[in-house]
Amino acid sequence: GPCAGVAVYSPAITDFIIMTKGRSYMFITGPDVIKSVTHEDVTMEELGGAETHSTISGIAHLVGEDDHHTLSLIRELLSFLPSNNMEEPPFKETSDPIDRVDESLNLLIPENPNQPYDMKILINTVLDDNYFFELQENFAPNIIIGFGRLGGRVVGIVANQPEHLAGA
């Protein structure tokens, strides 16, 4: 939902921000004050909606299309995190064989170091069940962050994306 004024400082320092399109807003002051001070018309969405915070400010890590989708994103995120600092992240059985070989990896990275390639293909290929849970997908496309599993164990991924601006 909406968060305005001094209360908006709290979400900015939390671990994860999940917003819902058309329903979640974060801003210090609203459109009416902006109008009275700058004489600009700005909507709540433009000022601090999910799109703004997932593409421009980078505050939002995940954005749901609706409440149902947002809740499913939260459940998926929590499936990678321990319940507390004294526990390990959840282990998940996989049907992937431990000695799985994928010949497509031999062709993914070009010989020419100046030629771009899609690092997401590599990430998805090596992770269990070819599944990568990406965070901040629409912010800074030259870097990739998220979670996956190797051998059932949770791993965090931080990677350059050579396909955009030659990576980070």
Where are these regions (language model features)?
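Short low-complexity stretches enriched in small and charged residues
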Residues: 13, 18-20, 108-117, 148
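Terminal amphipathic helices with adjacent charged low-complexity linkers/tails
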Residues: 62-123
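Generic secondary-structure boundary/loop-capping signal
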Residues: 23-25, 30-34, 39, 44, ...
